[in-house]
From Swiss-Prot:
GO CC terms, sorted: extracellular region
Keywords: D-amino acid, Hydroxylation, Neurotoxin, Secreted, Toxin
Species for this entry: Conus villepinii (Villepin's cone)
UniProt GO MF annotations: toxin activity
Tissue: Expressed by the venom duct.
Described purpose of this protein according to its UniProt entry: May act as a neurotoxin.
The family this protein is said to belong to: Belongs to the conophan family.
Subcellular location: Secreted
Miscellaneous note of the record: The mature peptide does not contain cysteine residue.
Major place of residence: secreted
Protein name stated in the entry: Conophan vil-M
D-methionine: modified positions: M5
Length: 7
């Protein structure tokens, strides 16, 4: 799955 840009 693609990585999320939330941290």
């Amino acid at each position: 799955e693609p990585n999320s840009m939330w941290s």
